[in-house]
Structures are given as C-alpha cells and as structure tokens.
C-alpha cells in the first residue's frame, strides 16, 4: 500500500488499462509479457487511478470506467474546454489519500494527454502530505495507436512500450514542492530537454521492430 505511480499520459483509457494488465501480469510472475491473461480471474483489486471528474462523467463508457477504480477530481485550471482558476477541493485530496492507504494509485501529473505540458503542483503536494513510494512510468506508442480516448484503434502495428523505473528518492520533509515537481518532470521524461528530433535511422529501426512485433 501507499504506492503512487506517476506517468506521462497519451490517451484517456488505454494507458490505465495497459497498466492494470502489466501490474497484474508482473504480480503473476510474468516478465515483459501480458499473454495468457488468466490473472484477470484473480486480479489485484486495490489499484486506483486519478482522473478528471469532467472526463469520467462524459458518456456511458466513461461512467463504467469510473467504477473500475477511478478517483475523480476537479481540475483547478480547466473546465469544459475553458481556462479557469479555482481552489483545490480538499475532498479530492482526501480521497486520493484514502486510496493510497488502501493500495496503489496511478496518476498523470500533467493532467493532460498533450506531451511536454507542465507538471501540476497538486501531485507534489500529495507526495509531501502522504509520503508514498513514488514510482515513475514512461509510456510510448499509445498516442499513435489509439484515438484520444484510447478506445478506437487509429493505426495498427505500432509498438506500445511501458518503462517502469526505480522508485524516486524523495526527502519528504525537506524538499520543496518545486524540487519534487522538477524530479517528476525528469522522471517521466516530460522536461523540455527530452524533446528531440529522431534520426531517420532510428525511425527505420522502430518501423522494422513494429513489423516483427508479436501479438
């Protein structure tokens, strides 16, 4: 319990669904494979994810997904496509704390599926307050494979990757909110220094790898 997974974000639902599978596959002794999904009959149930309340109320599927461990929170900076400024709802923070006490929580600290957007300070405050083990995750390929919701396949044959890193070393008492935000930014590879032009040779190698991918 009290484990917080922090990740970059590429789709609304495919990212989280993949993490549920990977976590349960790993707990079942599998390495780099989610084949033979027998573990779904006895999954780890105390896995939660933080999601925007507005997103989880939009449509039937979103409402169904909300029952699969969503901790819904109100965005403080955006609502219905418009920029807003509002205070953090203390109940949202409390609900995340309750989820951490019960199990594992997944959060996307940028609060958006757009790449290289700023890390929201709310995640750093949660870390300072509840002192969880913080495990960074870096995902790739989901944005190219799926639509924004992560439901409809946009392009087949794209390799999706998920790198689960070592826990972050955090001094909960002495590190500032800004220090923690900076650590998160680098850990999930969303700092501006990670923006780079991929050489043509690398792109070709990735395409060849996708062709060899086993489903």
List the model feature ranges, each with a label.
Residues 71-115:
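Internal catalytic-core helix/loop-beta-alpha segment
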Residues 199-215:
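Short, highly charged C-terminal tails/helix-capping segments
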Residues 180-188:
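Short, well-structured alpha-helical segments that form the helix of a local strand-helix-strand
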Residues 3-84:
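Catalytic core of membrane glycerolipid acyltransferases/transacylases, capturing the structured
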Residues 101-104, 111-179:
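A cross-family acyltransferase "interaction/gating" segment
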Residues 12-16, 57-60, 115-117, 143-147, ...:
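Short catalytic/ligand-binding loop motif for oxyanion handling, primarily in non-cytosolic enzymes
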Residues 6-9, 50-53, 108-110, 116, ...:
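Short His-Asn-centered micro-motif
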Residues 2-7, 47, 101-109, 132:
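Generic beta-sheet signal
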């Amino acid at each position: 319990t009290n484990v917080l997974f922090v990740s970059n974000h590429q789709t609304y639902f495919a990212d989280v669904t993949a993490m549920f599978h990977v976590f349960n596959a790993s707990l079942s002794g599998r390495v780099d494979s989610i084949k033979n999904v027998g573990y779904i009959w006895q999954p780890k149930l105390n896995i939660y994810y933080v999601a925007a309340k507005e997103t989880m109320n939009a449509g039937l599927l979103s409402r169904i997904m909300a029952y699969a461990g969503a901790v819904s929170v109100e965005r403080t900076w955006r609502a219905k496509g418009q920029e807003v400024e509002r205070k953090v709802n203390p109940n949202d923070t409390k609900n995340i704390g309750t989820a951490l006490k019960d199990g594992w929580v997944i959060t996307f600290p940028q609060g958006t599926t757009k790449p290289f957007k700023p890390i929201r300070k709310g995640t750093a405050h949660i870390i300072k307050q509840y002192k969880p083990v913080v495990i960074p995750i870096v995902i790739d390929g989901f944005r190219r494979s799926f639509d924004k919701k992560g439901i409809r396949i946009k392009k087949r044959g794209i390799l999706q990757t998920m790198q689960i890193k070592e826990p972050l070393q955090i001094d909960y008492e002495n590190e500032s909110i800004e220090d923690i935000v900076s650590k998160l930014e680098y850990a999930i590879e969303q700092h501006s220094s990670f923006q780079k032009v991929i050489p043509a040779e690398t792109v070709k190698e990735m395409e060849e790898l996708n062709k060899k991918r086993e489903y």
